């Protein structure tokens, strides 16, 4: 119904990389799902005649902490950019080397590992439907002890909605939610070990 009302509708699948395009214009995010620092895939039924400049951001793979810091800096940089660019050749090669089937299986497996251990400590009750490939495991700890344990270990803990305005009813929930990544089995084991 929205597509009928708004003919120029664009679907933001930045947290749904594996979601199939539904005929509407949509985009997803490479860097939110994979260890690359730039790029997205744009899907549209229209043929684009324009040739886009190539993105020149080239960051080397580093530690998770350094990568997260570079991710945040890159986020600010991308917010200042107002044009579409083609992804860099380096990122394109990295994406071509990814086994997407194996990646999706790994994400579901790690999600289920988190859910098995964390569900009793999570304010969010989750159901993963068949065919869903999640971006993260959203963890909203229901205990201050667990929160302190996690923060004391100096792990990179992503908060997607950090500092959400307190005037919104959702602020307490969103400010407390940690997006546990699903692309690193060793990281998941550390989180589970800390909480157990």
PLM feature segments, named:
Residues 87-115, 124-140:
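Conserved glycine-rich beta-strand-loop-beta hairpin in the small C-terminal domain of fold type I
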Residues 166-196:
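PLP-dependent enzyme catalytic core of the Aspartate aminotransferase-like
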């Amino acid at each position: 119904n929205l597509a009928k009302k708004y003919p120029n509708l664009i679907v933001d699948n930045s947290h749904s990389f594996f979601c199939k395009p539904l005929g509407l214009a949509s985009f997803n995010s490479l860097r939110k799902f994979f260890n690359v620092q730039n790029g997205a895939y744009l899907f549209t039924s229209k043929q684009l005649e324009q040739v886009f400049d190539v993105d020149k951001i080239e960051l080397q793979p580093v530690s998770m902490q350094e990568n997260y810091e570079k991710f945040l800096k890159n986020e600010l940089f991308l917010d200042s950019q107002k044009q579409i660019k083609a992804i860099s050749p380096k990122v394109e090669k990295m994406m071509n080397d990814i086994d997407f089937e194996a990646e999706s299986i790994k994400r579901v497996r790690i999600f289920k590992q988190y859910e098995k251990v964390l569900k009793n400590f999570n304010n969010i009750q989750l159901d993963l439907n068949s065919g869903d490939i999640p971006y993260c495991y959203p963890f909203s700890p229901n205990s201050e002890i667990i929160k302190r344990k996690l923060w004391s270990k100096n792990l990179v803990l992503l908060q997607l909605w950090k500092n959400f305005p307190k005037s919104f009813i959702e602020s307490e929930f969103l400010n407390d939610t940690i997006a546990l990544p699903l692309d690193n089995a060793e990281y998941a084991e550390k989180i589970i070990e800390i909480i157990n």
